[in-house]
Amino acid sequence: MTETPTGTQSSRETAADDTPRHRYTAGLAGEIERAWQQRWTQDGTFDVANPVGSLAPADGSAVPADKMFVQDMFPYPSGEGLHVGHPLGYIATDVYARYYRMTGRNVLHALGFDAFGLPAEQYAIQTGTHPRTRTEANIVNFRRQLGRLGLGHDSRRSFSTTDVDFYKWTQWIFLQIYNAWFDTAQNKARPVAELIAEFEAGTREVGDGRRWADLDAGERADVVDSRRLVYLADSVVNWCPGLGTVLANEEVTSDGRSERGNFPVFRKRLRQWMMRITAYSDRLLEDLDVLDWPDKVKTMQRNWIGRSTGASVEFGTDAGDIEVFTTRPDTLFGATYMVLAPEHDLVDRLVADQWPADVDARWTFGAATPREAVAAYRASIAAKSDLERQENKAKTGVFIGAYATNPANAKQVPVFIADYVLAGYGTGAIMAVPGGDQRDWDFATEFGLPIIEVVRPVADRPGEDTGAGGDVSQAAYTGDGVMVNSGFLDGMDVSAAKEAMTERLSADGRGRERVEYKLRDWLFARQRYWGEPFPIVYDADDRAHGLPEELLPVELPDVPDYSPVLFDPDDADSEPSPPLAKATEWVNVELDLGDGRKRYTRDTNVMPQWAGSSWYELRYADPHNTEALCAKENEAYWMGPRPAEHGPDDPGGVDLYVGGVEHAVLHLLYSRFWHKVLYDLGHVSSREPYRRLVNQGYIQAFAYTDARGSYVPAAEVVERDGKFFWPGPDGEIEVNQEFGKIGKSLKNSVSPDEICDDYGADTLRVYEMSMGPLEASRPWATKDVVGAHRFLQRVWRLVVSEETGETVVTDDALDEDTLRLLHRTIAGTADDYAALRNNTAAAKLIEYTNHLTKQSVTARAALEPLVLMVAPLAPHLAEELWRRLGHDASLAHGPFPVADERYLVEDTVEYPVQVNGKVRGRVTVAADAPADAVEAAALADDKVVAFLDGKTPKKVIVVAGRLVNVVL
């Protein structure tokens, strides 16, 4: 019977009596790492200069033109600290930055902390400790853990989004966006002051037949506020009474509950701050083409923005027109009913007092009147998430007792409300064509509504696949074909019918061609404490005013407690009461905003968690600037377009940004939006924040669950005869093994501190970089870490005697084979480091090290390049060996070895020899051997001769440099 621990048991090498005194052990690695980290800090090894400002060269010299800006998605400093999955991307970017620094590039690499958020606030609620106290303690621990890894960051540029000096500029950017509007003619944001100037000059119309000069102050403010890029709106939001706050869509699970706390979430209307990101839909789409980003991420953003071309159609009612957007105006004759979102503004105006005499009982929701039915239906769906509402389950809905006029045929169609139509998408209304849409077909079948065939498959077009189906009594037909039952469209194909119907609608004044987007404006407010306060106050008329820059920052006040008012989790009718409302002296303030001192009240919401991360790349470029978020010279140097290097369409931005694909849409879309506004307003020269993006994979590990499906600590599980057991509190139990993302929730975390203690940080770095391609997920196995450690021990032994500690290098010349392998390794690792292929770089270094070990090579000419090549992966070990090789200066700034092209040319080539397609032998010939010489060598090979057994080949094909194929 075998019993093997499956968890992360200690693997520290113990100092046995026979262990050489100067062996590279975990203990020696720790000493070397601490010493070099201290020296790097003292010398400012990774400090990098700016063109201007406090970080400019003290001697007034110019900064190098050849720069490189490398950035990680910064971490949230949780109380649990790091596990071994977290450093994967940080180590990869450090290897990349170190390589380019060694080649002479001026590299900016820094790391801050995304520190606002719910976890610190919830801890504060539970303990009464200020969130800042907990957050700053967590940051100290994160810096300690990250510091052990030897990451070459410019520590002068580090910050937290919770630093007042940082969020002052978050508030400043908010005001820039608030004080801007989007000029559709120029396709860019412009200052609101310019809009007002155009109104005053009469060069821009107010609309609705009104003149600016005839409006009073309040009306003028309303006109301007309606055009701002930040605006207040009564929006349908995700209200979570159990958390006392509004949640963004991404914070709600698919079953309509809060991601944190698992509380019910309800859809309701609240007055909220919104950002008009939709104004930038086309630019956000178009500029994806110039970004060096993974195709997967670009596709996700394109789908999220969701651009589609169709027609806007107006259906007349007694309470006003219902506008719908459709990509299939050709099917308008098949629209037999309409559906509004239950929250649609028109519902309360359209709903009838009584049911029509012949109403179908299925349409009434069991209510006595349409109004009662609407109220009951709204209550029944209040807790459903958007995803739940759109899933293909049984269709529900209510007839509201009203009808609309189909503009194609003037027929009256009943108007329903149903949960599968969402108020926040499109117009919040659809024309239902059950013959051409399966969802509409399901609804029509459920409620006994007419289903009309309007597109008929054409079976007599040779080679044309018109799609299955066509019998609309069985299912909707969504394929191509010709129009039927469609009046003047009959006989047209779908494409022609779309164009014809759109033209008819436009001519009749009942519609027009239109482009629609799935993207919605950004809900930009949270009813929490631990976030950036809004630089907004309200006057006695409840009108919002942006604060002037000289009144920034608006600092978070202390409050009696940090929790919002929490409600019964099922109380959908409750209203938010944010924690900041409790700071009454802070809320009620007297200010002079240019028209004398007046009483105002501050906004008591805070910004969402995405605010700081939407611009933080700019602060790395100029972290100590008190006059601007980033000096233009510094932004242009680090992030400005470089068409000579990246092509004429270069948008500028950070040279490399690495982080998880989970941020593909929200963070990256929001940061692109903010950056484009800043670009339009002249604050930055780059039109995109991130020129190149790489998504690292996950580190995964085995996890274990008991019979209830609950996770148990992986480190405590043992394996016996292929089964797994956990010594639980009530005795040992058998558990199930599964594989998943490493982390706290699966109880399979491994701390990097453990690996650093047992092997050293350089071993952890080499192991994580050797596990596979950066973009791929990879399995963690602590037992395999020793392989990386043994590789570093071999490198150490090539330079240092384990017995004496003396340097053992010589000045011997290198033989031809070693020279060729050395320069192939230099060329290969340089290419790999530049392409983030750190796993293959490590493999090449291991191959070269093994060659030197087997051949007992001790020549300085072979070992110094090895140390330099190892440096990006294992910088502490490399620095120490470089010092022992007689160099006083750090190797952090290179030089990285340069391959000699002469040794990259092969003198000989090995040809596999195939006989009838199968390899039967191999021959080595001169690289420049002619085809007849290669053929002769192949036919003379002993194995080939034996296989031919005297037979004469019909043909011999020589593929130069690749293979020989003998055909019998």
UniProtKB/Swiss-Prot annotation:
Origin superkingdom: Bacteria
GO cellular component, one term: cytosol
Amino acids binding ATP: K744
Main subcellular location: cytoplasm
Composition bias type Polar residues, residue spans: 1-13
Catalytic activity entry: tRNA(Leu) + L-leucine + ATP = L-leucyl-tRNA(Leu) + AMP + diphosphate
Localization of this protein: Cytoplasm
Similarity comment: family membership: Belongs to the class-I aminoacyl-tRNA synthetase family.
NCBIfam families reported for this sequence: leuS_bact
Name assigned to this protein: Leucine--tRNA ligase
Encoding gene per record: leuS
